[in-house]
Amino acid sequence: MESWDLIIIGSGPAALRAAVAAADSGTTPVLIESSGIGAGNSNLDLAGMAASIDEISSSAHRDDTITAGGESTDKIAAARVCGEGVGVLAELERWGLVLRRRDGGLPHASQVSGHSMPRLTGCGDATGRNTTRILEEQAMKRGVLRRADLRAMSLVMDGNQVRGITAYDMSSGEVVGIQSKAVILATAGHQGIWSGSANGAGLGSSLAASAGISLSGLANNPTHPLTVRGTDLNISIDVLGSGGRVRKSSGEDVAS
């Protein structure tokens, strides 16, 4: 039976960054990308990365995140993620991500819904694609194996300890077992169940729930505000942050 230190299920920036971190720590990971290599959820519509680049601290960013997320927000996680924003952005720049710039050389920051300050940085509508490419390069440099021929079906549990996964091998048509010491679910969200697959089909949530793992924070489900009806096309939210306007056929503003 195939065996790994770590199985990472997902194909977007979160999965790729987890693989890079695992490899750097001396762990041997494998990426299970059932949607196909390069088909990560954030490839097209990632608007940018929020970072407190013009603020003394990340406390206001943390507070905005908690307010937007509601009472179920994990405050400790919000503080950690917001606090790491500037460092993560600098790391991606060192690895080759070319950000939009403003006069003076600092990254351009847009103000978007949910933020009290301009924080959204990135590469315009190429942010998702470029971020994924940079992380793919880093994963390749570390020799991370990426499997696009498998689709995760279930987690294999031994009490409260995960022992691996069962997966459908699309090349052979067989169901196979893969052992691992740990599994990271880095899939897209599940809001696409209501709004379209481009916003996440809920694979990670489904795998966890089916294995008896308690889910939390599901009361508030984010939805992409600029999804074109009847399609899986998401328009980058940075369109609004850069001064764009959404109007009804009457000319009345819907958002700006």
Task: Name each region found by the language model.
Residues L46-A47, S72, S110-R119, A186-A188:
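Gly-rich Lys/Arg/Thr-decorated short loops/hinges at beta-loop-alpha junctions or inter-strand turns
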Residues R62-G70, H115:
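A short small-residue
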Residues G69-H108, V112:
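Rossmann-like flavin
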Residues E91-L97, P118-C123, I237-V239:
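Short, charged low-complexity intrinsically disordered segments located at boundaries
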